[in-house]
């Protein structure tokens, strides 16, 4: 009698070809790859997977960082972990399309989740678990405008030589690293933790910069006064605070009910004041709603603007009153 199959057992992943973007693959149509089965542990699901290594041209050697299953779940490249369709970070894509991160982060739940999705992908006609067509029109238009249409091969360049920066490199032309000083916005190789954050779309500095610039271009620049934590929804239909709260959570899945301090609706002006507990959450919600072109409440699209600080009472009147003669 054969042994019972344990569905919770940590498995392995085997593939014949990687899932890569055009930039990571390089300009050479005759690239040669080295294949190593179970060569490394996937950065996301921690399963041994087939690792591919290649030289994309004159740049450094590159390799796959996550397994093909995790890449199919998110629709990303196995090396740079950017979206395959738009070439943008997953945090930008998910914010524009109002997608919720459903993948669990705990070890046991990840294994169970991966195994179930593998079974679903095996039965699906295209073998994929990510559907990029299910999205609102405004979000897709924003992604198309921000998408990089041509491959950016400079991303494949070797890293900067740290010894050259210190003035201690003695290898000269034989050094495999770049001999130039780093720029202010140039970052080093991301760590494993930052790769995982990029995959799940959280705490990604590149995505935050893209979303902030997009919000500023649409008039949603965050005010300098850090005490302002209010967003104003304009052009609302007849609704109550529960409708506004449900629309906000649906458009911004990262917003929890506890993050919203209060919602005040002014029916005469068809607007609502949404007060957040923290300024960072208000900024993140503003960036996401700007990417979606506003927020839809009860079938009507509403405009989003930042609130203003309340005018402080002038202390001069009180001082003048106290200084008046008796």
Swiss-Prot record:
Gene3D superfamilies: 3.30.70.330, Zinc finger, CCCH-type. GO terms for cellular component: Prp19 complex; U2-type catalytic step 1 spliceosome; U2-type catalytic step 2 spliceosome. It is found in: Nucleus. Its main location: nucleus. A zinc finger (C3H1-type) spans 155-182. It comes from the Eukaryota. Coiled coil: none annotated. The keyword Metal-binding applies. One of its GO terms (biological process) is mRNA processing. Associated with the spliceosome. Belongs to the SLT11 family. Involved in pre-mRNA splicing. Facilitates the cooperative formation of U2/U6 helix II in association with stem II in the spliceosome. Binds to RNA. This is Pre-mRNA-splicing factor SLT11. It comes from Cryptococcus neoformans var. neoformans serotype D (strain JEC21 / ATCC MYA-565) (Filobasidiella neoformans).
């Amino acid at each position: 009698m054969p042994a019972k199959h344990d569905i919770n057992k940590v498995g392995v992943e085997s593939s014949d070809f990687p899932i890569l973007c055009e930039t990571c693959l390089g300009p050479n149509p005759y690239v040669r790859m080295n294949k190593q089965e179970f060569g490394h542990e996937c950065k996301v699901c921690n399963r041994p997977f087939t690792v591919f290594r290649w030289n994309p041209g004159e740049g450094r050697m590159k390799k796959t960082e996550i397994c093909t299953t995790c890449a199919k779940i998110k629709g990303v490249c196995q090396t740079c972990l950017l979206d395959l369709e738009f070439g943008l970070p997953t945090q930008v894509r998910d914010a524009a399309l109002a997608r919720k991160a459903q993948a669990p982060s705990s070890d046991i739940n990840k294994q169970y989740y991966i195994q179930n999705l593998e079974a679903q992908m095996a039965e699906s006609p295209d073998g994929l678990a990510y559907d990029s067509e299910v999205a609102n029109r405004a979000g897709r238009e924003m992604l198309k405008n921000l998408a990089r249409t041509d491959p950016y091969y400079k991303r494949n360049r070797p890293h900067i030589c740290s010894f050259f920066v210190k003035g201690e490199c003695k290898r000269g032309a034989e050094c495999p690293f770049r001999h130039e000083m780093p720029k202010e916005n140039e970052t080093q190789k991301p760590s494993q933790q930052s790769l995982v954050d990029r995959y799940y779309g959280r705490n990604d500095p590149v995505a935050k910069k893209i979303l902030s610039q997009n919000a500023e271009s649409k008039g949603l620049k965050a005010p300098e006064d850090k005490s302002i934590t209010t967003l104003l929804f304009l052009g609302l239909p007849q609704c109550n605070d529960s409708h506004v709260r449900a629309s906000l959570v649906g458009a911004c899945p990262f917003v929890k009910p506890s993050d919203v301090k209060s919602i005040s609706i002014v029916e005469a002006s068809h607007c609502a004041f949404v007060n957040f507990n923290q300024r960072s959450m208000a900024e993140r919600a503003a960036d996401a709603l700007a990417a979606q072109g506003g927020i839809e409440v009860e079938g009507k699209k509403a405009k989003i603007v930042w609130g203003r600080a309340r005018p402080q009472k002038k202390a001069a009147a009180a001082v003048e009153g106290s200084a008046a003669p008796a």
